[in-house]
Amino acid sequence: MAGKKGSSPNVYAYFKVDGDKVSRIKKVCSRCGKGTYMSEHKDRNTCGKCGLTEFKQ
């Protein structure tokens, strides 16, 4: 069994639950499609799978 006892899963970093509604927090990669999320940096969003980089304005 991996991880520390009592640690929360990373899935909570990707979704937000408001009552009965679930919404995505992180941006989905436009090249890879659903299921691939982009990491957030200070000045850009980057996909770890395909390497797509979108710079923030």
Curated annotation (Swiss-Prot):
ZnF C4-type: positions: 29-50
GO biological process, any: translation
Residue positions binding Zn(2+): 29, 32, 47, 50
InterPro entries reported in the protein's UniProt record: Ribosomal_eS31 (IPR002906), Ribosomal_eS31_arc (IPR022845), Ribosomal_zn-bd (IPR011332)
GO molecular function: structural constituent of ribosome; zinc ion binding
One of the record's GO cellular component terms: ribosome
Note on how the cofactor is bound: Binds 1 zinc ion per subunit.
Keywords associated with the record: Metal-binding, Ribonucleoprotein, Ribosomal protein, Zinc, Zinc-finger
Cofactor: Zn(2+)
Tree of life domain: Archaea
Assembly mode: Part of the 30S ribosomal subunit.
Family: Belongs to the eukaryotic ribosomal protein eS31 family.
Protein name: Small ribosomal subunit protein eS31
Organism lineage string: Archaea, Nitrososphaerota, Nitrososphaeria, Nitrosopumilales, Nitrosopumilaceae
